[in-house]
A protein has these predicted regions:
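Periplasmic binding protein-like
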Residues: 18-19, 88, 222, 353-406
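N-terminal lobe/hinge region of extracytoplasmic solute-binding protein
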Residues: 19-71, 101, 166-168
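Periplasmic-binding protein-like
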Residues: 231-234, 259, 263-302, 343-347
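Structural transition elements
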Residues: 292-325, 339-345
Length: 408
């Protein structure tokens, strides 16, 4: 959202107040732990990456001024010179090596570790050049190094302080209260032209959808994310607000932990998948602001979307066939919270209702928003979730679906 009165050409000055629909008291400045938009936005406000994805969806250099590879296996990144961290330290190749080593070492708990398993070595070749060796060719590797976890931080004696809020970004972190807010002031020495226009930025965690939308309608914040489809038409009638809607790779999911009972049973999983009225979710939860998913994370925005796969449909007979084959009986719990996405609890209720038509009993457990990503997601057997998606198919699968990534 943006005030229509603001000119299209940016002017320097002012304070940007952003109401974010995520945030938790368990949040940390360790970029390896970033798991919600409050923290990814925080990190990208005070930091930079080797590469970045532009607003047009295209890959472009950021702290790496250029990159090259003759075989897609050995990648050379030439660093931008004259860049300073907020503590005054000049960016060098040692900072890049230390940052990547932090995320890829065998004891790392970083969510980016799975992305870097193909990296066999990283070394500095002078102060402004980094060489990365892969175990196999990967033409999409420059996309991987733009991952929001791989925020470049200053090093000392080959190590980074993962908990520091020091970066090379357009704004200097002033204050950080996990699950509450983060405040920033413009970096007077920012290297990137045409960026960082505000004097100050304040990000406020507003988990409640109604409170978040009231805040932007009342002028308490200047912009919000995660607009509820149910009330988007109401917001559109406010003359000072503009609704920005784009197609992308964001998708809503209800993942099952297949290593825990009863979801380790394939027949049970198939029974549940055929018990869902997917079009009903698009119509009643997204109100048309979305499209059908088909149990894989590659959207129509990706070039290799599998459009030929038969769409899974609500099929009571097939669902019951698999349910009987599973041997399961009793209630199945589905944990839900609007922390996952606006309408997640209602979506879970619709899933439970359609499953009841089949003869499967689902209990919707309404979970608190605070701490959801630390205490429920990846902990409970079945829950509501969302993924921002990734620009490439390999990146998406490497982030969440390989067996040694922190998020699988």
């Amino acid at each position: 959202m943006a005030d229509k009165a603001m000119a299209a050409t940016p002017n320097k000055g002012g304070i940007m107040r952003y109401g974010v629909g995520h945030g938790s008291t368990t949040d940390s400045l360790d970029s390896g732990t970033f798991e919600n938009s409050m923290m990814t936005n925080t990190g990208m406000t005070f930091g930079n990456h080797l590469m970045e994805i532009g607003s047009d969806g295209q890959l472009r250099p950021e702290l790496a001024e250029s990159y090259e590879s003759s075989d897609a296996k050995t990648w050379i990144f030439n660093l931008r010179q004259g860049v300073e961290f907020h503590n005054g330290k000049t960016l060098t190749s040692e900072d890049v090596v230390a940052t990547f080593d932090y995320h890829r070492n065998e004891d790392s708990k970083s969510a980016a570790r799975g992305l870097l398993t193909a990296v066999t070595s990283i070394k500095a070749d002078g102060p402004n050049r980094v060489i990365m060796e892969l175990n196999a060719p990967n033409a999409g590797f420059p996309y991987i190094v733009s991952d929001y976890h791989l925020l470049i931080k200053p090093s000392m004696d080959g190590k980074i302080d993962s908990q520091s809020g020091i970066g090379t970004g357009g704004y200097v972190l002033q204050d950080f209260e996990p699950g509450v807010r983060a405040t920033f002031k413009r970096n007077a020495n920012y290297w990137k032209e045409g960026a960082a226009h505000f004097d100050e930025v304040e990000m406020i965690s507003l988990l409640d959808t109604a409170a978040r939308q009231s805040a932007v309608m009342n002028g308490d914040v200047d912009a919000i994310d995660r607009v509820d489809p149910k009330t988007v038409a109401l917001l559109a009638r406010v003359p000072t607000l503009e609704i920005l809607e784009v197609a992308g790779t964001l998708h809503y999911t209800m993942p099952m932990r297949v290593t825990s009972e009863p979801f380790d049973n394939l027949d049970l999983r198939l029974a549940l998948k055929h018990s869902i009225k997917r079009q009903e979710l698009v119509d009643k939860i997204l109100l048309g602001h979305g499209s059908l998913g088909n149990d894989h994370p590659i959207s129509t925005a990706n070039p290799f979307h599998a459009s030929g796969l038969p769409q899974r449909e609500f099929n009571p007979e097939l669902a019951m066939k698999h349910y009987k084959a599973s041997g399961h009986s009793g209630t199945i719990q589905l944990s839900a919270s609007d922390a996952a996405f606006a309408g997640a609890v209602d979506a879970a209720q619709l899933v439970a209702a359609s499953a009841k038509e089949v003869g499967i009993d689902i209990e919707v457990v309404r979970e608190p928003s605070d701490g959801y990503w630390s205490n429920v997601w990846n902990k409970k057997g079945w829950c509501t979730c969302y993924w921002g998606g990734r620009p490439t198919e390999d990146w998406m699968y490497s982030s969440a679906y390989v067996d040694d990534t922190e998020w699988n």
